[in-house]
């Protein structure tokens, strides 16, 4: 894929992707997190990954999220924008950090690996109908969401419920279930994800989630 320049604006686009992206640190060589001496910086986020791929394929795409007013937030916005994704609706939070995570290389035979997330209290976890530009979210043909966002906080879940509620002018809803048990603070995860999936027009689900 060839990176292009960032797009910014509030005009209608083909696809809007809403979700947290984090700075990803991957080891310079195989080994446990306790033993690896150095890491290479990248980015990670199911929704922003989809946005970058769609933009590279020629679609007009907007990524909506919140990042910290920090260097990691700057890196995420610049990296995702370099694929031609509209990043003009990404909010900056002066009080909460950008999330990061560390991941070891997977075992070739079993894909076993370690992941350490540092996302609790992140800027993206503070997303809600009050902190996100909902007009920018609705100005599209397709709105792409995921179950990860629903698990981040009560405000994030409230935002997804508002966006998926039936009503005139609602864009087509694309929903990636993306069930991550460790993110849910109670046993309501499957019930909430089923509720959101039933509201969606297009649902992506893995074999282990069906």
Language model features by range: what are they?
Residues 42-49, 127-129, 185-188:
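Short secondary-structure boundary/capping elements
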Residues 2-86, 109:
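Glycine-rich phosphate/adenosyl-contacting loop at the front of the ribokinase-like
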Residues 10, 136-138, 194-197:
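A short, aliphatic-rich alpha-helical micro-motif
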Residues 142, 148-210:
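Conserved beta-alpha-beta core of the PfkB/ribokinase-like small-molecule kinase fold
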Residues 30-33, 77-79, 131-132, 157-160, ...:
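Short, glycine/charged-enriched secondary-structure capping and boundary segments
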Residues 60-147, 173:
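Conserved N-terminal subdomain of the carbohydrate kinase-like
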Residues 18-21, 26, 67, 120-121, ...:
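Fold-independent oxyanion-binding glycine-rich loops
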Residues 2-5, 87-88, 129-132, 161, ...:
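A generic local structural motif
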């Amino acid at each position: 894929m060839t990176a292009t320049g960032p797009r910014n604006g509030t005009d209608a686009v083909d696809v809007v992707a809403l979700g947290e992206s984090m700075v990803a640190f991957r080891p310079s060589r195989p080994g446990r997190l306790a033993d690896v001496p150095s890491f290479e910086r990248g980015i990670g986020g199911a929704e922003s990954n989809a946005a970058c791929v769609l933009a590279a394929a020629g679609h007009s795409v907007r990524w909506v999220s919140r990042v910290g007013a920090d260097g990691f937030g700057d890196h995420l916005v610049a990296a995702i924008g370099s694929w031609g994704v509209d990043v003009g609706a990404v909010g900056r939070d002066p009080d909460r950090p950008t999330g990061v995570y560390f991941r070891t290389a997977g075992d070739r035979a079993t894909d076993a690996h370690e992941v350490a997330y540092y996302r609790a209290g992140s800027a993206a976890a503070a997303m809600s109908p009050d902190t996100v530009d909902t007009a920018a979210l609705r100005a599209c043909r397709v709105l792409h969401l995921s179950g990860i966002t629903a698990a981040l906080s009560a405000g994030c879940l409230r935002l997804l419920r508002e966006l998926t509620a039936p009503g005139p002018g609602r864009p087509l809803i694309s929903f990636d279930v993306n069930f991550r048990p460790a993110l849910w603070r109670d046993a309501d995860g499957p019930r909430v994800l089923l509720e959101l999936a039933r509201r969606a027009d297009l649902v992506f689900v893995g074999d282990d989630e069906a």
